[in-house]
Structure formats: structure tokens, C-alpha cells
Amino acid sequence: MDYRVLGVVLLSFLAYTCADPVKFVDCGSVDGKVVQVDIKPCSQQPCKLHKGQSYTVNVTFSSGVESQTSKAVVHGVLAGVPVPFPIPIDDGCKSGIQCPIVPQKPYNYVTELPVKTEYPAIKVVVEWELRDDSSKDLFCIKFPVQIVN
């Protein structure tokens, strides 16, 4: 194997694994606190999401309450209007979280975010909520993305 090719592969891998966490804002987390948000692959911010590809979203958070269930609700906010952004699995207990959720324990909510080919190529703010038994937000975060061809 050519050493230049190996070097490019290693640098690409390092860029992929050493990407900065996604910058986000809290949008009303009632029952929890988000520590970090990661999207893979995402080498720059806002993340460029390519149509027809899937991305892994990992939200590290802690809960302030006990909850037997958790449900994700995702919207793309366009001109201040939330538009539903369907995800394949909205059950947080099937997305890296071992339920029941208990207070003060760290959790990693991990799921796939598919970007459909029919989505328009635009900049959008993603609003991601994970709700508890009482439909209160364990977390609510917003972060910008750009959907590209």
C-alpha cells in the first residue's frame, strides 16, 4: 500500500473522529440537562447533511426525574414554523437508553437521522425533544444544519 494513501486514510479518520461537538442551544429542557451533542459524520458547523444519507445523532444528557418511557419528537424550524422531521425510531428506550430512566444518571441517546432525497436543499434549525412519561422535555435542543445535494 502506498504510504501517501495510508496517510490520507489516517487523516480522514482523525478528522472524522475528532470533530467538535455540535453547538446547540437549550430550548426548554424541563426534566434534564444536555451535556453534549454529536453528529457523525459532521466535519464542520453547521453540519452539512447530504440528501440520501443517514447520520448518527448522539445526545449525552442527565435526567432530573424518573421516567418509564421516553419519546423523541423532531422538527425542522423554517421561518419560525416547526415542520415535523420524522425519524425511524422515536422510542428513546430503543435508542441507547436503558429504561426506566433514573435521576442524576448520564445517558446517551443515540439514533439515526435519515435525510430524504425529497428534502429541499436549505439551511434549517433542528429542534429535537426527548419527552418523559408526563410529556415534559427530558431535553429540548436546537442546532443549525444545512441540507445539501
Curated annotation (Swiss-Prot):
**Record flagged with keyword Glycoprotein:** yes
Record Gene3D superfamilies: 2.60.40.770
Q: Which residues form the signal peptide?
A: 1-19
The molecular function terms in GO held by this entry are: cholesterol binding
Compartments reported by the entry: Secreted; Endoplasmic reticulum; Lysosome
Superkingdom of the organism of origin: Eukaryota
Catalytic activity line of the entry: cholesterol(in) = cholesterol(out)
Give the sugar-modified residues.
N58
Biological-process GO terms, alphabetical: blood circulation; central nervous system development; cholesterol efflux; cholesterol metabolic process; inflammatory response; intracellular cholesterol transport; motor behavior; myelination
Q: Which UniProt keywords apply?
A: Cholesterol metabolism, Disulfide bond, Endoplasmic reticulum, Glycoprotein, Lipid metabolism, Lipid transport, Lysosome, Secreted, Signal, Steroid metabolism, Sterol metabolism, Transport
Give the InterPro entries listed for this entry.
Ig_E-set (IPR014756), ML_dom (IPR003172), ML_Npc2-like (IPR033916), NPC2-like (IPR039670)
- The reply on keyword Protease is no
Give each disulfide bond as a residue pair. Answer: C27-C140, C42-C47, C93-C99
What do the Gene Ontology cellular component annotations say?
endoplasmic reticulum; extracellular region; lysosome
Its family?
A: Belongs to the NPC2 family.
* Role of this protein: Intracellular cholesterol transporter which acts in concert with NPC1 and plays an important role in the egress of cholesterol from the lysosomal compartment. Unesterified cholesterol that has been released from LDLs in the lumen of the late endosomes/lysosomes is transferred by NPC2 to the cholesterol-binding pocket in the N-terminal domain of NPC1. May bind and mobilize cholesterol that is associated with membranes. NPC2 binds cholesterol with a 1:1 stoichiometry. Can bind a variety of sterols, including lathosterol, desmosterol and the plant sterols stigmasterol and beta-sitosterol.
Q: How is this protein organized at the quaternary level? A: Interacts with NPC1 (via the second lumenal domain) in a cholestrol-dependent manner.
Domain note: Binds cholesterol in a hydrophobic pocket; there are no hydrogen bonds between the sterol and the protein.
Q: What's the name of the protein?
A: NPC intracellular cholesterol transporter 2
Source organism of this protein record: Danio rerio (Zebrafish)
Task: Give me the gene this protein comes from.
Answer: npc2
